[in-house]
Amino acid sequence: MFSRYSSWEALPAAWRENKRQSAEWLLMRIQRHRTTKEPNEPFRILSIGSGIGYMEKLLLDAMPDLELYVNEPSTVGLKWLRSYLPADRVFIGFPPLCLPPDVSFDMIYISAVDYSIATRDFLFLLEALRAQLLPGGELICLSSSYLQEDSYIGSFVNAIKIVIRAVLHYLGVRPQQFWGWRRTRREYQQLFKQAGLTVEEDGWLEKTAETYWIVGR
């Protein structure tokens, strides 16, 4: 990708606009949450699966004093973002194993990566991240792989997905090589509750109806 694009600004405009809307929504929540802290108290936030870091760059542009930490499995993806952050705020690897157990956060968000995580592993991740929240902290999931529930299409897609996974499993092929995990609103709420989180609220980004969000404490 980096051989094709020279900077964030060179990326497709539609993709950047989608990320910008998500970042603006996060900024709104951060600003609201910061009012509960002392003026000089740092606000510590962790991004899980930052990718190439465009949303994080937008957050830092808007709030230069934000104590932002990022996680990404690959060192390559953060090539552009590294100049924005101290080295000790970058965690490379798979969470929660790569995260320092002695650091807690006011907010942790997972954006558009949960589709790549099997349900059992996603539950384990939510439980581990909940343990790293400061009192009153928020755990947020932004999902662009949301599956409409109570619809014929949604039920049909789920049924086909189950059949394909069974066939691939029988053939000895790991299904996550080809298919992600799409979840309904009810499934997200259930996973958050199973992880010991209280679901504060959930909904859809106003300008991007396909992006679902859920907040737990």
Q: What positions do the PLM features span?
A:
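Class I (Rossmann-like) S-adenosyl-L-methionine-dependent methyltransferase catalytic domain
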Residues: M1-K37, E41-F43, S47-P100, I140-R217
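A conserved beta-strand element that flanks and buttresses the S-adenosyl-L-methionine
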Residues: Y109
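Short catalytic micro-motifs in class I SAM-dependent methyltransferases
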Residues: A112-S116
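Short N-terminal helix/helix-N-cap motif within the alpha/beta-hydrolase-1
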Residues: A118-R120
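A short glycine-rich, Lys/Arg-flanked "PGG" loop and its adjoining helix->strand segment in the class I
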Residues: L123-P135
